[in-house]
Amino acid sequence: MFVLNKFHNILHYKKIVPVVLLSCVSLIGCSNSNAQSEPPKQTNQANQIKQENTGNQSFAKLEKEYDAKLGIYALDTGTNQTIAYHSDDRFAFASTSKSLAAGALLRKNSLEALDQRITYTHEDLSNYNPITEKHVDTGMTLKELADASVRYSDSTAHNLILKQLGGPSEFEKILREMGDTVTTSERFEPELNEVHPGETHDTSTPEAIAKTLQSFTLGTALPIEKRELLVDWMKRNTTGDNLIRAGVPKGWEVADKTGAGSYGTRNDIAIIWPPNKKPIVLAILSNHDKEDAKYDDKLIADATKVVLNTLKATE
């Protein structure tokens, strides 16, 4: 649902009304013919509820069209409006967690420490290694591993980052310290992508993961130099062109991290910068009923369009 801070105007109205009535009674010229006021205009709150219902109907329509389940949470940081659809339901986070793990790495280490070189072997390579497989002989710095993990979704890079943090449980501990009591991390790649219905390991909710991403990129979880580094990696992500990026108008900036897993899981979490406006935090998670289901990136792009159109309608 949306959150709009309009109560100041309501309170101000309540203070003024008695004064107006008193003035009317005390004046002889206040006649019954002028007593009837114009019908009240639709309030912003009513318009908000109307747009929320419209958005929910549109999301449900997309779910039916793509035979999928959607989970959405969006926050316009300029207006504090929110959109929530299945926002408290758990979904496998898949590779979206790579952006959070990179944030945790930045939180735990100095920028100088990121120059530490990590060595690994062919046995350490995971299921998807577009960058790390090229550097087995030389190893990679922590900074290079974070770049590979976030921008190319390199699974070995993610695993090496998790090991540097102390394992999935220590990664989760860092999230707890930040106030995220929902997101769970138990396994490495590629196992973390296999989550069956009802399981909670390696999952989050749209609202929880969006707020944690916001803390890392826009909040106080990291000092500004580290925030800028994480945002830069996400802005230069190479895997998201067909997802949230495909659903925003031309000229808008997007920093995102995608993910995919079993049961047709397809996710994207992002910070979106409209021109001359404050950023929008957006998490779109999705899955299907069948374990071997195929995902369609267009679902995420279409859901993004609904989110942005709904936010625009309630401005």
Regions found by a protein language model. Give the residues of each.
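Mid-domain, small-residue-enriched loop/turn segments at the edges of structured enzyme/sensor domains
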Residues: L160-L218
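Short, glycine/proline-biased beta-turn/loop segments that scaffold the active-site neighborhood
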Residues: L111-H135
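Sec-dependent N-terminal signal peptides of Gram-positive bacterial secreted proteins and lipoproteins
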Residues: F2-N5, L11-N34
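Conserved catalytic neighborhood of penicillin-recognizing serine enzymes
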Residues: S126-I161, P168
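Active-site SXXK
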Residues: N80, A92-Y120, L282
